[in-house]
């Protein structure tokens, strides 16, 4: 089955930080795996069709907010059989991006989410969700859905978040509001 190209999808992944280079504001992370997400959707890493195209404009966004400036760029994208690894260089000129980088460096944030256009998908009737066998990457995003929602509360209370826009966004976010 071929899914319509005009329907961008988002697939969140709890993520795993593999390496942080504070001097370069660089984070190496697993941004997706073949494990099913909460809706039962699966991304096949080898199905990424446009890696070269994406790397010509390798934007990394905050929570898929296309109307905001990117918080960084992808310097390297590595496809393995069961996962996708990205090296994200956060913007040093943006206080917002600096705060997001600090949250990853301190282990407060670990989540990532890819925004993509499905090209070929197979529904999984028994399990729900779909297997995306071919897809085009639009962007990936740093997302504030850590495994422990209390981490956001601690980050704000400890003064680790300095950017006013990020503080405001977290304070207004539905999930954050539940723990603040």
Where are these regions (language model features)?
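Signature of dsDNA virion morphogenesis modules
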Residues: 1-169, 179-180
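Noncatalytic, helix-rich "gating/capping" subdomain that lines the substrate-entry/channel surface
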Residues: 170-174
């Amino acid at each position: 089955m071929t899914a319509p190209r005009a329907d961008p999808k988002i697939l969140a992944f709890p993520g795993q930080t593999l390496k942080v280079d504070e001097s370069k504001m660089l984070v190496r992370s697993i941004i997706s795996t073949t494990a099913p997400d909460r809706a039962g959707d699966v991304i096949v890493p080898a199905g990424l069709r446009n890696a070269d195209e994406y790397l010509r404009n390798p934007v990394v966004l905050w929570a898929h907010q296309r109307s905001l400036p990117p918080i960084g760029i992808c310097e390297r994208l590595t496809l393995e059989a069961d996962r996708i690894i990205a090296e994200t260089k956060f913007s040093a000129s943006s206080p917002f991006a600096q705060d997001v980088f600090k949250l990853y460096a301190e282990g407060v944030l670990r989540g990532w989410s890819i925004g993509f256009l499905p090209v070929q998908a197979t529904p999984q009737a028994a399990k729900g969700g779909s297997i995306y066998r071919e897809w085009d990457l639009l962007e990936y995003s740093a997302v504030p859905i850590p495994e422990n929602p209390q981490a956001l509360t601690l980050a704000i209370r400890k003064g680790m978040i300095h950017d006013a826009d990020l503080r405001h966004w977290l304070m207004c976010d539905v999930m954050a509001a539940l723990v603040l």
